[in-house]
Amino acid sequence: MGDISTVSGDLANLNIKNKRFLILGASGLIGRFFIDVLMHANKIYRLENTVIAVGRSRDKLLNIFSSYIEDDCFSIAEIDINKKIPNDLDCDYILQAASNTHPKAYATDPIGTITTNIIGTQNILEFAREKKVERTIFFSSVEIYGENKQDIKYFDESYMGYIDCNTLRAGYSEAKRTSEALCQAYISKYNLDIVIARISRVFGPTVNLGDSKASTQFILNGVHNQDVILKSKGDQLFSYSYVGDVVSALLLLISKGVKGEAYNVKGLNSDVTLKQFAKSIASYSETKVIVELPDEVEKKGFSTATVALLDDKKIKNLGWTPKFNFDESLEKTIEIMKEELFS
C-alpha cells in the first residue's frame, strides 16, 4: 500500500531504528497501521525495529498479523491491561492505544470503557516505570475538550469545554481526561517520559468492521455501494484525520515531542460537517444520503459535541505536516476495503 510506504519514509528520516515497540490496542485502526509501517520500514530500510503487538485476543492478533508471524522482529502478546503487565516483556517505546473507541461500545460496555483507560493506563505506566522505558505515547482524544462553549473556533491544547459528567456518555471523555492527569502524576513523581497525542476523529482502511462511529458506517455504506445513512441532520462540524497522517504524527512525537506536553493531531483540509462527510462518500459511490432515526443504544453512545475543531499549530511547530488529502483518502479507504472484503 502506497500510504504505508510514504509513512515508512518518515520513520526512516527520523532515524528510529533498533528500537523495541510495545503497542497496546494493536488490533485497532491506528495500531494496525502503525505496525504495518514499522514492518514495512524494516523490510525496505533495514531499521531492525522490534514489534510486540498486544491485544486481548491471541486468535484475533494471529488473524490480523498472519503475514508477520514468522518474522523475528514481530511477536504478539495476549494481555488484559486491566491486570498487571507481565514483567518478562522488554521495550523502548510504549504506545497506549488500548480503549473502546466507538459509540456502541461506550453504551454497551461503559465500565470497560472507563477501566481500560484509567486502570489499564496506570498498569502500563507502572510497567514503564519498572522497565525504565524511554518514552510512552498516550493516545488521548479530541473528546477531552468537551462541548465548545462558543467562545472559540479551534481548540488549542489549553482549551477546556463542558462535559456533563453525570451521564453514561461522559465515561470515555472523562476517562481520557483522568488518564492524562495520571500521566502527569507519573511524570511528576517518577520522572517518566510521556507525550500525549490528542487525536481527532480517525478513518482509514484498517478500521474494525464492528466500529459504530458515524464516519465508519458511512465508509461501509460506500464499500457496499449502499445509500449513505445519516442518523442526524449532519450539522456537527468536526476535525478528522486519515490514519496515515496520525501514524506519521505519532512517529514525530516519539522522536521530537516534549515530555509532558499534549499535541493535537488532525488531517489535511479535514474540518467538515457530518453531512459533508456523508455526501463525499455518496458522490464517490454514486449513491444517495438517506436520513434515518437512531435507535436507543445508538443515542446513548452519541457525542453531544456539535463543533469540535482542532488547532494543530503546536505539532506543526515540531516540523510535522499532514500529507494525505481528505477526499482522496476517503476514496482510497473505500477501494482498499472493497479489495480486502471482496477479493
Report residues per predicted region.
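Glycine/proline-rich active-site loop of Rossmann-fold NAD(P)-dependent oxidoreductases
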Residues: 149, 177, 203-217, 226, ...
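Amphipathic terminal alpha-helices
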Residues: 1-15, 36, 46-49, 326-343
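N-terminal Rossmann NAD(P)H-binding glycine-rich loop of SDR-like oxidoreductase domains
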Residues: 20-40
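Conserved C-terminal active-site "lid" loop/helix of NAD(P)H-dependent oxidoreductases
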Residues: 243, 276, 298-321
